[in-house]
Amino acid sequence: MYRRIENKETDSIKENSKLIMHIVWIFCIGIFTVAPELIKLFINAGYAEASVIVPPICLGIFFQMMYTFFYDIEYYHKKNKQIALFSVITAVINIVLNYVAIHIWGYQAAAYTTIISYMILCVLHYFGMKKVDKTQYYDLKTLISLSAVLIMITIANVVFNNSIWIRYAILLDSGIYILIRYKSLVISLYNNILEKIAERKKQSN
């Protein structure tokens, strides 16, 4: 990563980061789609209501992933004090939000305060990155669009938590989008898997 930054390999960084964004994006959707069934199956049906906090937790993970993109640029430019300052600011905000929200709405509020904290941290690191390096390393349009769609899907999964058909329909649509978006990559991976299987069969014979 840092070698690419040094060499200004912006196209490579941009394409790799977009792929990572999409992988984490579909991973988050997959996790909170199957969460209600997994909780009932492996934990206890009495904890089924806990499944409603899985979508916001996954959304928080997505924003956590995004801020690391901007963090890498800041770290490359040795802006350690700036990085530390942003972490402290976000930690204080998170503590205050938790103190207020948990007392009012209960433990589930912690999942939403975490989202807010990571979103703030993401924004801080983005502007911190732009302050030290004006190079366009990331596709901001993709980042914003994926974030917006994931927020809407998160809300839909919380609202329709008890509707298995709606949840899995959203997952199916999201999966189709990924397959279309990375059709050539999926085909390439599929062909590589077939080649490896064929090689192993030859070796076994």
Language-model-detected regions and their locations in the chain:
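Hydrophobic transmembrane alpha-helices of multi-pass small-molecule transporters
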Residues: C28, M65-T68, A91-N98, Y118-Y126, ...
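Alpha-helical transmembrane segments
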Residues: F70-K78, H125-L140
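Specific pore-lining/lateral-gate transmembrane helices of multi-pass inner-membrane transport
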Residues: M1-S87
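Membrane-proximal transmembrane or re-entrant/amphipathic helices at the cytosolic face
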Residues: N157-N205
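Membrane-embedded alpha-helical segments of multi-pass transporters/permeases
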Residues: C28-P36, L41, I53, I95, ...
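Juxtamembrane "helix-exit" motif on the non-cytosolic side of transmembrane helices
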Residues: I39-F42, I155-N161
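Membrane-interface helix-loop junctions in multi-pass transport and translocation proteins
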Residues: S51, K78-K81, S87-V123, V158-L172
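Interhelical loop/hinge segments that connect adjacent transmembrane helices in multipass membrane
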Residues: R3-D11, K131-S145, N191-K202
